[in-house]
Design a protein with these regions (language model features):
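Extended aliphatic helical segments
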Residues: 2, 11, 34, 62, ...
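Basic side chains
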Residues: 5-8, 90, 103, 186, ...
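N-terminal secretory targeting signals
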Residues: 1-73, 319-340
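A generic structural signal for short, solvent-exposed coil/turn residues
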Residues: 11, 19, 68-70, 117-119, ...
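Domain-terminus/edge residues, biased toward the C-terminal soluble/receptor-binding domains
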Residues: 5, 192-196, 204-340
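Active-site-adjacent loops and short helices of periplasmic peptidoglycan-processing enzymes
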Residues: 27-226
């Protein structure tokens, strides 16, 4: 008799859960959704799925606005930061050269080392001969000088300094090769299945590839788990070495786009122009990734188009928090008359 009552209770609850459009019982997880401006809830269940196919046109549940946005970049993606929901995609799994957007992973590992206590912002970082030989963007480190982690992060985030990137990698892992192993391990943990890192800075190297989807994943991890990084990624102009070294952010959106919070630019002759751009407006945080844009102007313009599309068509609402009681349900023919 007791067993039959329990069965009736379970069946009743199941029916109620599927019929009534109300959040019931205690929330076991944060109930977070993305809503479009027509009032329709956007499903977030596929936010990290590996089932998304190579192109947005062929993938399931990946909105594609290529025709209306007119993007010329080889690959692009727009995601909502809190849920990871894909709001737009174009060739999101195409493997391309990331250039200095690679440094998002380098910065992530630095921030994780700080949060774990293995590193502090005040630690002094030496510069090796190897670090001084880096080409591309740099602040011309000298083997006789040391900079703090705080200063190194500023140089990496603002001017994409390759010499500082290598110095940090060597300090954390003993060598750049060992650090790259850590980068690839972390990429696998994040489900970045399109990615193979060959270096920590992003200069062109055969086999050093990733996708806009994967860049969005590591960007999301960095911004969500380590929001303090925005202290660096939102700097427009600053200086080092007692004002002798001037820094101007390579990400022009920091100056020109309302709500911009980062994140990282990258370009080489082979990669063309890349960008991971983040912004927040009205509690909605978005990440737009552009890869293989024809010109630097195109990458910023097209990132703006993606962000504008997101802010104009979606909004963010948190309906309940974990453990919060949000309602009661009447139980028919059950031991208890209602459950919370």
């Amino acid at each position: 008799m007791v067993i039959h009552k329990k069965i009736r209770i379970i069946v009743s609850l199941f029916i109620i859960f599927n019929i009534i459009f109300l959040p019931i019982a205690k929330a076991t997880n944060d109930s977070i959704y993305v809503w479009n401006n027509n009032g329709n809830k956007i499903d977030t269940s596929n936010r990290t799925t590996d089932a998304i196919q190579t192109t947005a046109e062929a993938s399931n549940n990946v909105p594609n606005k290529t025709d209306t946005l007119g993007l010329t970049s080889g690959s692009a993606i727009l995601i909502e930061q809190n849920t990871g929901r894909i709001l737009y995609g174009k060739n999101i799994h195409e493997k391309l050269r990331p250039a200095s957007v690679t440094k998002v992973m380098t910065i992530l590992l630095i921030m994780e080392a700080i949060d774990s206590g293995k590193l502090s912002y005040s630690d002094k970082i030496p510069c090796s001969q190897n670090a001084t030989k880096m080409g591309g963007s740099q602040i011309w480190l000298d083997t006789k000088e040391t900079l703090t982690v705080d200063e190194m992060l500023k140089a990496i985030c603002v001017v994409s300094a390759n010499d500082c990137t290598v110095a940090m990698a060597e300090y954390l892992a003993g060598s750049t090769d060992a650090f790259v192993e850590k980068m690839n391990k972390r990429a696998k943990e994040l489900g970045m299945n399109d990615t193979t890192f060959k270096n920590c800075h992003g200069l062109d190297e055969d086999g050093h590839l990733t996708s806009s989807y994967d860049i969005a994943q590591m960007s999301r991890e960095l911004l969500t788990k380590h929001p303090d990084i925005k202290k660096y990624t939102t700097i427009w102009m600053d200086s080092l070495r007692d004002g002798k070294s001037q820094l101007v952010n390579t990400n022009k959106l920091i100056r020109n786009y309302t709500g911009a919070t980062g994140l990282k630019t990258g370009s080489t002759s082979l990669a063309l122009y890349n960008l991971s751009a983040s912004a927040t407006r009205n509690n909605l945080s978005l990440i737009a990734v552009i890869m293989k844009a024809p010109t630097t102007k195109d990458r910023f313009n097209e990132a703006e188009k993606l962000l504008d599309y997101g802010f104009n068509n979606f909004s963010y609402k948190q309906l309940s928090k974990k453990g919060e009681e949000v309602g009661k349900v009447t139980v028919i023919k059950g031991i208890e008359k209602e459950v919370k």
